[in-house]
């Protein structure tokens, strides 16, 4: 129903944020990663959104990137995983590490997440591996490398957002850097992206 909300940050806590959009304050449940990526109160931000509809309540979930929202929705497809546990997974591990654990068939990497036991970790991998493979870039689908680069792209973009750049400008700059140097670290990508935007 909603793709994203753009508005003024009212408050940010480790597990929730309030965004004011056109005079209306919306409360979102968020991961700790999204919490860290949001600017201070008073600044503008974008939260990619998932609306959970239940008989007794409507709840908005907010994400710092489309990748995080996409993984959240995939986790909801796993039997026995609801919004609370899906958000716990995203709070416990970066998106790229979850992708890597699934692609590498390594359930032990998910055990450290609160609420995820051996059976749940095994189900996540069993039920999502094929879906994650389809999401990986061509030529990288069979290895964790594609997921790692996805995480680098996400982290570098979020770093540029915290510096005040628009999401469009940040994404374009990061994409250009990764195309020229796919093996760069997050720090290298951010530095190169800043240089590229400065020279425009």
Swiss-Prot record:
GO cellular component: cytoplasm; Holliday junction helicase complex; Holliday junction resolvase complex
A Pfam match: RuvA_N
Location of region: Domain III: 154-200
SMART domains, per the entry: HhH1
GO biological process: DNA recombination; DNA repair
Keyword Transferase assigned: no
Region ranges (Domain II): 65-143
Compartments where located: Cytoplasm
GO molecular function: ATP binding; four-way junction DNA binding; four-way junction helicase activity
UniProt keyword terms in alphabetical order: Cytoplasm, DNA damage, DNA recombination, DNA repair, DNA-binding
Source organism, top-level taxon: Bacteria
InterPro entries assigned: DNA_helicase_Holl-junc_RuvA_I, Hlx-hairpin-Hlx_DNA-bd_motif, NA-bd_OB-fold, RuvA, RuvA_2-like, RuvA_C, RuvA_C_sf
Region annotation Domain I: where it falls in the sequence: 1-64
Region annotation Flexible linker: where it falls in the sequence: 144-154
Described function: The RuvA-RuvB-RuvC complex processes Holliday junction (HJ) DNA during genetic recombination and DNA repair, while the RuvA-RuvB complex plays an important role in the rescue of blocked DNA replication forks via replication fork reversal (RFR). RuvA specifically binds to HJ cruciform DNA, conferring on it an open structure. The RuvB hexamer acts as an ATP-dependent pump, pulling dsDNA into and through the RuvAB complex. HJ branch migration allows RuvC to scan DNA until it finds its consensus sequence, where it cleaves and resolves the cruciform DNA.
Family: Belongs to the RuvA family.
Subunit structure: Homotetramer. Forms an RuvA(8)-RuvB(12)-Holliday junction (HJ) complex. HJ DNA is sandwiched between 2 RuvA tetramers; dsDNA enters through RuvA and exits via RuvB. An RuvB hexamer assembles on each DNA strand where it exits the tetramer. Each RuvB hexamer is contacted by two RuvA subunits (via domain III) on 2 adjacent RuvB subunits; this complex drives branch migration. In the full resolvosome a probable DNA-RuvA(4)-RuvB(12)-RuvC(2) complex forms which resolves the HJ.
Domain commentary: Has three domains with a flexible linker between the domains II and III and assumes an 'L' shape. Domain III is highly mobile and contacts RuvB.
HAMAP family named in the record: DNA_HJ_migration_RuvA (MF_00031)
Descriptive protein name: Holliday junction branch migration complex subunit RuvA
Gene symbol of the encoding locus: ruvA
């Amino acid at each position: 129903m909603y793709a994203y909300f753009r508005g003024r940050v009212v408050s940010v806590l480790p597990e929730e944020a309030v965004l004011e959009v056109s005079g209306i304050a919306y409360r979102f449940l968020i991961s700790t990663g999204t919490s860290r990526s949001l600017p201070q109160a008073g600044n503008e931000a974008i939260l990619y959104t998932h609306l959970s509809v239940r008989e007794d309540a409507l709840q908005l979930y907010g994400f710092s990137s489309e990748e995080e929202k996409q993984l959240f929705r995939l986790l909801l497809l796993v039997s026995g995983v609801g919004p609370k546990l899906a958000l716990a997974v995203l709070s416990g591990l970066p998106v790229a590490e979850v992708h890597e654990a699934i692609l590498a068939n390594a359930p032990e990497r998910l055990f450290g997440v609160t609420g995820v036991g051996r059976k749940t970790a095994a189900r996540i991998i069993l039920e999502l591996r094929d879906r994650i493979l389809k999401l990986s870039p061509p030529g990288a689908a069979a290895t964790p490398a594609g997921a790692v680069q996805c995480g680098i792209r996400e982290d570098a973009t979020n770093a540029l957002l915290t510096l005040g750049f628009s999401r469009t400008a940040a994404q374009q700059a990061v994409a250009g850097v990764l195309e020229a140097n796919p093996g760069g670290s997050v720090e290298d990508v951010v530095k190169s992206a800043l240089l590229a935007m400065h020279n425009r």
